[in-house]
Regions:
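Small-residue (primarily alanine) positions within well-ordered alpha-helices
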Residues: 20, 24-27, 37, 51, ...
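Short loop/turn microsegments at loop-to-beta-strand junctions
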Residues: 12, 33-35
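Short beta-strand scaffold segments in enzyme catalytic cores
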Residues: 35-43
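A short, polar/charged loop-to-alpha-helix boundary motif
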Residues: 56-70
Length: 177
């Protein structure tokens, strides 16, 4: 079993999730799902942004262009296959595919805002085609636990702010409706 280098005293930072929220709004503005992600690197007492992006599933026409996968691929291309000193922030709970990628990359920690339950409940309540996502309801925590690396998960981080993304619509004023 490999050692994860994120210290046990690690606390997620609001500013990084807020950047993921900004990226989610940009994704929505260009016609995609309002999902954003940021990957940071810990170096001593510092934590710096290495990558940030918004989802591209709709605009790319590829069902696997999840923002978590895309940011992990980008960071791996410059920092190597394993990322034990990196933290993934996502506005939405990573799906089973993205959580699996976190295991394979040996990410140091995962922080997310809204849960799969939040996402599913919103889709059922609003019943629009846009929110009838195909979902494999296997929790991120379950996948990470099965990976055997003891990757820390910080769930429901800035959850209320991330839930507002469900209502976010592209507009000239970028307001919530």
């Amino acid at each position: 079993m490999d050692r994860i280098v994120i210290p046990p005293t690690y606390k997620p930072k609001k500013k990084f999730m807020q950047l993921a929220i900004v990226e989610a709004k940009r994704a929505r503005d260009r016609g995609d799902y309002a999902i954003g992600a940021v990957i940071t690197q810990l170096s001593g007492n510092r934590e710096v942004v290495i990558a940030s992006a918004g989802n591209r599933v709709k605009t790319s026409g590829s069902s696997i262009k999840h923002v978590e996968l895309e940011t992990l691929k980008y960071v791996s291309s410059g920092y190597g296959r394993y990322l034990p000193d990196f933290v993934l922030y996502s506005t939405h709970e990573p799906c089973a595919m993205c959580a699996g990628a976190c295991v394979w990359s040996k990410i140091g920690a995962v922080v997310f805002g809204v849960s799969q339950e939040d996402i599913t409940a919103y889709g059922k309540k609003h019943g629009t085609e846009e929110f009838k996502w195909r979902a494999c309801l296997i929790s991120c925590k379950f996948v990470l636990e099965k990976g055997g690396l003891h990757i820390p998960v910080f769930d429901s981080f800035l959850r209320l702010e991330c839930r507002k993304l469900f209502r976010y619509r592209a507009s000239q004023t970028n307001t919530f409706r």
